[in-house]
């Protein structure tokens, strides 16, 4: 980095001293500081150095403060909240389906920019979003929970569930891959480009898990979702076979069977609480 940014000896020694003194033998801390300095003009490096506190949690807290002061603070927090709760890393397209405020951002470079604003917590590799380290996710779920989940973790799970059902209702249809023939061998199926399931692949497999983890049995919206004529009832009546087809194309039938069993258990549990 020193060569690339053409640091003089004074700046190079100051950076080395600060990294050595404050890293506490944590390579990730060094990597995050260097990532920030990479985007810092050489003339501002010495001033910037003093803003990096020692220790990972302190550094994450500092980065969280920077996000909170940005113009996109609320959007970044919603992205962080969603990424912290998904059950596997999601692609940019899948993230747009889960976060309503991203719907109007059609430009891929803008989406990358938003993920970049969360760069101390998130990284983007081949269109898929990952945490830089498990400690970043742990920080959001514990120390920063009140800021990232102001209405509670369960509420974000429920939002992801409703967004998932919305994208599935819009994309699930008969013969999505244009296979035409019944009983087409699964091993011969080739993913078309563009993929009709690109935005809904995650939701297809995990929507029921988010419903179960929302655990909002006293919520009016939760209750109405499970009632006869509610959004789940309507979805299963209108899209159930297409959803099974989607699961098959996602190679998610085994997970779908488990999810349906979880949904049935949830309905029974809610019935005992006089929902119906």
PLM feature spans:
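Aromatic-residue hotspot detector
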Residues: 1-2, 27
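Short helix/loop segment immediately N-terminal to the Walker
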Residues: 2-11, 73-76
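Leucine/isoleucine-rich amphipathic helices and adjacent mixed helix/strand linkers
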Residues: 14-17, 21-276
């Amino acid at each position: 980095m020193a060569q690339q940014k053409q640091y003089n000896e004074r700046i190079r020694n100051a950076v080395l001293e600060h990294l050595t003194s404050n890293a506490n033998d944590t390579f990730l801390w060094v990597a995050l500081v260097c990532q920030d300095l990479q985007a810092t003009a050489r003339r501002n490096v010495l001033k910037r150095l003093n803003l990096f506190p020692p220790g990972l949690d302190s550094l994450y807290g500092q980065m969280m403060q920077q996000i909170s002061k940005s113009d996109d603070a609320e959007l970044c927090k919603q992205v962080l909240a969603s990424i912290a709760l998904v059950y596997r890393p999601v692609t940019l397209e899948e993230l747009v389906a889960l976060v309503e405020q991203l719907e109007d951002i059609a430009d891929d470079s803008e989406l990358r920019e938003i993920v970049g604003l969360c760069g101390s917590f998130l990284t983007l590799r081949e269109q898929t979003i990952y945490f830089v380290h498990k400690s970043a996710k742990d920080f959001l779920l514990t120390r920063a929970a009140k800021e990232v989940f102001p209405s509670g973790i369960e509420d974000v799970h429920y939002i992801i569930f409703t967004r998932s059902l919305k994208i599935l209702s819009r994309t699930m249809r008969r013969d999505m891959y244009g296979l035409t023939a019944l009983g087409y061998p699964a091993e011969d199926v080739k993913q078309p480009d563009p993929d009709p399931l690109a935005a809904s692949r995650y939701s297809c497999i995990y929507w029921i898990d988010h419903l179960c983890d929302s655990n909002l049995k006293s919520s009016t919206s939760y209750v109405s979702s499970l009632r006869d004529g509610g959004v789940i009832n309507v979805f299963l009546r209108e899209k159930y076979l297409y959803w099974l087809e989607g699961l098959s194309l996602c190679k998610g039938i085994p997970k779908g069977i488990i999810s349906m069993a979880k949904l049935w258990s949830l309905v029974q549990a809610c019935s005992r609480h006089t929902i119906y």
